[in-house]
Each structure stands twice: as structure tokens, then as C-alpha cells.
Amino acid sequence: LLLLFVLPMMAQHPLFPTPAKVQNGKGSFVIGKNLQVQGNGGYADKLAAGLQTELKEAGLQSSPASGTIRLDLTNDCKMADEAYTLVVEPNSILLQASSEAGLFYAKEALLQLSRFGKGNVRACKIQDQPRYGWRGFMLDESRHFFGKEKVKQYLDIMASLRLNVFHWHLTDEPGWRIEIKRYPKLTTEGAVGNWHDPKAPATFYTQEEIKEIVAYAADRHIMVVPEFDMPGHATAVCRSYPEISGGGEGKWQHFTFHPCKEETFEFISNVLDEIVALFPSPYIHIGGDEVHYGNQSWFT
């Protein structure tokens, strides 16, 4: 179904998401072996070097053609924070933005156009900026653990689509997926199992792996928002530390935290202290999920 919407837009212009404004020109720019990629200093130089490498790794420089791609981080206060301009002419390409995020999005747009045209980028002028400040993708790793390399692939796809918030669902009923040093049983016991197999070997991220992924996301202007699910869907926690379990019923055993024990709030506070230290995001998602599979304390 998505293709029914995407293909007509790509007939007009192959960039996705559809940019705010496009003016098509004449001719095209060829990504060649003698290509020069330049920045105007600082972050633009760093991004230019990365773009040169990405174009080479994508195998797009088969032609002997020359040309210049310039990345310009400008002080133009008229440009919105994440906005960019991309001007493609037969002999040159200009990427311009007033913020690092905007210039990064211009680079991603150019890569997308280059891959679509297999090294040929048709002449155009694109002026674009996001319609929404929060452009997110959620990944549930409690039910299905993917691992560090797969998460990085998702982050690369997010960057290509100019998404900027990675909502990381790391805890739920099937398993706990983040190392908390103060509570080791969260990973030795709580990380055992997944949605399909409750006895699957423990899988989780160490704190060093979390830091690596957060840094990888930051390089792509993506904020990572972790989720510590509570007070419901706390099964993985409560089977590891049953003293804070609020009980459950039927197949939903240990579904909630116990709301009437001081130890519960001490546990939550200590866990949040470690999570906050790992994630620079101003936001931590705490779920707020249902508690109807619990003891009667929740109804008083």
C-alpha cells in the first residue's frame, strides 16, 4: 500500500520524504572519479569527508567525470533550524544550511538522489525543512532482541528519511534489555526469554554498548529516548526481584510493581539514575501502561 503513495511522488521527484519545494532544471550532475567534495570549514569539512567516502562505498563513481560538491554551513538567520537548500547543476552541487542538522539532511538527500539515479543527479533546486519537530521511530527489543549492528542499520535508515527520534522500548513482559549495575539479576534472569520463547538465552545491551549506540545516533542527529515500562508490563523485573511484584492473575503473573512498598520506589529511582546517566535525551519514557492484571492495592 505504501508504494501506491510513494511511486506517484517519485515520478515527480525521487526524493522521499517529499521535499517542501522543488524546481527541476536541465541536465544532470554525474558523480565521477574526479569528483571534489569540499566544506567551508569545521563541521562542513567533516561532513564533506564522510560524503566522499559514502559515495565511493556506494560504487557511484564509475564515470571519469569531474565536478564539485560544496557543503556550506551558513549564518543565514532566515533559514529554519533544520532547513536546507540543495542546488544541483551540471558541473556543481551546493548543499547549504544554517544548522549542522540541516546540512546533514542535505547530505542525506543528495545520497538518496545519487543512489536513485545510479550516479546521475538531475539538475534541480530543492528547498526543504521538516513539517514536524518530532519525527520518531519505535523499536521494541523486549519482545524481539535485534542487537547492536541491526540497531545501527535502523539508525542509518532513519537518517536517510530525516527522522530524528529513536524511541527504544527496552523493557516489557518478555525481557529486560539494559544492564543496570546495581541490579544484576535484571540481566541474568530478567533478560532471559522473548516473545516466542520464554526460555531463550539472556540477551541485553551492556552500558558500554548503550553509549556506543547513543553516540552513533547523535552523529546522525537522532535523539534516543529509552523506555522503562511501568507500572504494568513489569514481568521481567518482578520475576527477577519478586519482593517488589504487585502480583497478577492467570497467565499474567508478576505483571505490575507493588504500589504500596517503599522498596518499589527505591528500585525505580535507582534504575532511573543509571538510565539517565546513559542517555543525554531530556526525555525518559516510563510507559504508564495498564495495571489491571495486579493486586487489589491498585484499586484502593
Annotate each language-model stretch with its function.
Residues 1-14:
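Bacterial Sec-dependent N-terminal signal peptides
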Residues 12-134:
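Contiguous, structured surface segment used for ligand recognition
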Residues 41, 75, 141-143, 170-172, ...:
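A mature extracytoplasmic/lumenal domain signature
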Residues 45, 181, 238, 293-294:
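Residues at secondary-structure transition points
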Residues 56-60, 242, 300:
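Glycine-centered secondary-structure boundary/capping sites
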Residues 80-285, 299:
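Feature activates predominantly on carbohydrate-active enzymes
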Residues 289-294, 299-300:
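N-terminal leader/propeptide and maturation segments of large enzyme subunits in energy/redox metabolism
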